[in-house]
């Protein structure tokens, strides 16, 4: 999808860019049967406490039900439309199956309207088809990857992301994947993945241009802890500009902020990571 640039008619327009939706999208009307209401929570939980900061005030939107499991085996589907989804960075494709059912999937790069797709172990290695990792040859780029068989995809769902199959272990139980971040990890060979790279890869190149566009998306400002009140942040308080008053910078919850690993070392999936993204960049 191409980028669209604007003339500097105002300070907000200067350097602003956006995606040219007319170049790739085929409709602006979503499938009504696959829409649900998406309530606004502004980052609050059921007690009204903020659990996710910097959220609130976004435009009204409806949620598109996406098929992350891709479990409709041995039934051919045809790509009817490529659509915009306000809930994610990737575009989505409406698939109409020969039995009459319709489903949304993530739209991979180079997926075309009218193209046939399928799911299951017997599917061909073509863009948009979903297969168990055990059936996909080495060197193939995949996305929409499951972590547990049948649980639905959890990895590689954002625009422009991919993973490449590097090999298999001795027993054939695990498949080794290289992620775009540089991480190498094992995933069960019975987990499913979709062939291809997630489309809309220019999404990361968009220049927001002005604060109002982020507010429209529901992203509120992020400010320094030193300009907050002491009840909001350990760095807050004082008359005017003040040092943080601590030996080292802290998070809003009082934990050390610099050089501290945040991943739980007892997390079960740690043993499946062969090489972390940080080790790859060294």
UniProtKB/Swiss-Prot annotation:
Composition-biased stretches (Basic residues): 263-282
Coiled coil: none
Stretch list, region Disordered: 215-282
Xref: Gene3D superfamilies: 2.30.30.30, Nucleic acid-binding proteins, Ribosomal protein L2, domain 3
SUPFAM superfamilies per the UniProt record, alphabetical: Nucleic acid-binding proteins (SSF50249), Translation proteins SH3-like domain (SSF50104)
Keyword annotations of the record: Ribonucleoprotein, Ribosomal protein, RNA-binding, rRNA-binding
Signal sequence interval, chain numbering: none
A GO term from the CC aspect: large ribosomal subunit
Any Pfam family hit: Ribosomal_L2_C
Classification via InterPro entries: NA-bd_OB-fold, Rib_uL2_dom2, Ribosomal_uL2, Ribosomal_uL2_bac/org-type, Ribosomal_uL2_C, Ribosomal_uL2_CS, Ribosomal_uL2_dom3, Ribosomal_uL2_RNA-bd_dom
BP term (GO), one: cytoplasmic translation
Segments traversing the membrane: none
GO MF term (any one): rRNA binding
Record-stated family: Belongs to the universal ribosomal protein uL2 family.
NCBIfam families per UniProt: rplB_bact
Record's subunit section: Part of the 50S ribosomal subunit. Forms a bridge to the 30S subunit in the 70S ribosome.
Function in brief: One of the primary rRNA binding proteins. Required for association of the 30S and 50S subunits to form the 70S ribosome, for tRNA binding and peptide bond formation. It has been suggested to have peptidyltransferase activity; this is somewhat controversial. Makes several contacts with the 16S rRNA in the 70S ribosome.
Protein name, as recorded: Large ribosomal subunit protein uL2
Organism the protein comes from: Mesomycoplasma hyopneumoniae (strain J / ATCC 25934 / NCTC 10110)
């Amino acid at each position: 999808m191409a980028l669209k640039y604007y003339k500097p008619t105002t300070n907000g327009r200067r350097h602003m860019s956006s995606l040219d939706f007319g170049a790739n999208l085929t409709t602006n009307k979503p499938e009504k049967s696959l829409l649900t209401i998406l309530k606004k929570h502004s980052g609050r939980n059921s007690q009204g406490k903020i659990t996710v900061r910097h959220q609130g005030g976004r435009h009204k939107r409806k949620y598109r039900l996406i098929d992350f499991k891709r479990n409709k085996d041995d039934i051919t589907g045809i790509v009817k439309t490529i659509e915009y989804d306000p809930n994610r960075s990737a575009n989505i494709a409406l698939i109409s199956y020969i039995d009459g059912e319709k489903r949304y999937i993530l739209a991979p790069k180079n997926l075309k309207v009218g193209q046939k797709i399928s799911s299951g172990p017997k599917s061909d290695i073509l863009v948009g088809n979903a297969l168990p990792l055990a059936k996909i040859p080495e060197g193939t780029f995949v996305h929409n990857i499951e972590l547990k068989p049948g649980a639905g995809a959890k990895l590689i769902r954002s625009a422009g992301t991919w993973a490449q199959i590097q090999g298999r272990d001795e027993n054939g139980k695990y498949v080794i994947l290289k992620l775009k971040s540089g991480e190498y990890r094992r995933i069960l060979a019975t987990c499913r993945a979709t062939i291809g790279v997630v489309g809309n890869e220019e999404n990361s190149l968009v220049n927001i241009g002005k604060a109002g566009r982020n507010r429209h998306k529901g992203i509120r400002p992020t400010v320094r802890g030193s300009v907050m009140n002491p009840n909001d942040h350990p760095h807050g308080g004082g008359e005017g500009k003040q040092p943080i008053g601590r030996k080292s910078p802290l998070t809003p919850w009082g934990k050390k902020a610099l050089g501290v690993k945040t991943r739980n070392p007892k997390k079960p999936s740690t043993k499946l990571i062969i090489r972390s993204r940080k080790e790859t960049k060294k």
